[in-house]
A protein has these predicted regions:
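Active-site nucleotide-donor binding segment shared across nucleotidyl transfer reactions
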Residues: 239-270, 274-278
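Basic- and aromatic-enriched surface patches that contact anionic nucleotides/nucleic acids
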Residues: 20-81
């Protein structure tokens, strides 16, 4: 497995040398780590290098940071249509071994993630994102099924989740393993509460869960903000109406709205941008344009970040956005870059607000 500037190349071999009867890689530490992590075959080639010094210093610290690891995992599972994400709820985490054995009968678990939440409002935020699917009115109804889950789980002893990322063993149609797990654990967790295990049932839902659990920016927002923005929620209704009206497939909210979601200052409207290709397909030029009552498409000359980051990367690289209500929003770091380029009086004030926030919080 090799990631190069010019793209993925599956036959880039890692050179292996022999020393005292043992074989060692002479290069490709990151590739080797990734292959080991995902249980992939490591393509190798022998070399005649001998009498090399094999140091251990590189193993004294992680070869890959958490941010890099999540980025690698996100892209791996995003590209795998047969991948599935399983979320084990706190009441069932104690039966994780039984659940994993059941999942491994049809899938191969490639990665596990333990997620701990300290506060009830963090639990509410997480459930909101898990089930949002572009629904702004989550928790707005008294009989909301998600709110019922929240009320039950918050009374438990812990808010610990186990997330399992798996890949199907075969392409054959699978049984409803989620239902089977719930039934097998019914004596411990009430099936009707639906708080045993959740699993992605489509590629779209799988990708949505990846944007929650393998996006450090989304998890940061979930763990940071204890109040929901009623103003942003009301504006997002017009934004969603606009996206549907123009059949826009992918977009990202920029402007002041990300600042509002972190409680820095109130927003007044929704500004968003598209990829260059979709912008052309929809017949929009590079100039800003009002598309809804409170929704505007921004100027992209040549792109939103003036050449530093492509608009396509801005919307597809999870390092540049977080998810709220199932929708993508530019990170504060991205907005600081944009506003420092614009350098208007209001942008300078926003940069100071962002700087002050970052100093007080440990950003991902």
């Amino acid at each position: 497995l090799s990631i190069k500037i010019n793209g993925y190349y599956p036959y880039s071999l890692i050179k292996i040398a022999e020393s005292n009867g043992s074989f060692y890689p002479t290069e490709g530490a990151h590739r080797t780590s990734i292959c080991r992590l995902l249980n992939l075959k490591i393509p190798t080639n022998t070399t005649n290098k001998r009498h090399l010094h094999w140091g251990v210093d590189s193993f004294k610290k992680p070869l890959i940071s958490d941010k890099e690891l999540n980025f690698i995992l996100y892209n791996y599972f995003f590209l795998k249509d047969t991948a599935r994400v399983f979320v084990v709820f706190p009441p069932a985490v104690g039966y994780a071994d039984q659940i994993k054995e059941k999942i491994n009968s049809q899938y191969k678990i490639k990665h596990e993630l333990n997620l701990h939440l300290d506060e009830d409002w963090q639990l509410k935020n997480l459930l909101r994102e898990m089930y949002s699917n572009d629904r702004v009115d989550v928790y707005k109804r008294d009989n909301c099924s998600i709110l019922k889950k929240y009320n039950i789980i918050k009374e438990g002893k812990s808010h610990d989740f186990l997330i399992l990322f798996a890949e199907a063993n075969t392409t054959n149609k699978k049984q409803d393993i989620k239902k089977e797990i719930r039934e097998e654990l019914s004596q411990f967790v009430n099936v009707k509460d639906f708080i045993t295990v959740h699993a992605s049932d489509s590629i779209e839902e799988k990708n949505s869960l990846l944007n929650v659990f393998l996006n450090q920016n989304t998890l940061f927002h979930i763990k940071t903000m204890n109040k929901e923005s009623e103003l942003v929620d009301s504006l997002l209704k017009d934004y969603l109406f606009t996206l549907n009206k123009y059949n826009i497939k992918d977009s990202i909210v920029v402007g002041s709205t990300p600042l509002d979601l972190f409680g820095l200052r109130k927003t007044t409207d929704i500004d968003f941008c598209l990829s260059e290709q979709e912008r052309k397909e929809k017949g929009f030029d590079q100039n800003p344009k009002k598309l809804g009552v409170s929704t505007d498409i921004v100027s992209q000359k040549p792109n939103y970040l003036r050449g530093e980051i492509s608009d396509y990367a801005l919307m597809t690289n999870p390092n540049y956005y977080f998810v709220y209500r199932g929708l993508k929003f530019a990170t504060l770091e991205v907005m600081k870059k944009v506003k420092s380029i614009l350098n208007r009086k209001k942008d300078i004030k926003d940069c100071l607000l962002i700087d002050d926030f970052i100093k007080k919080r440990k950003m991902p």
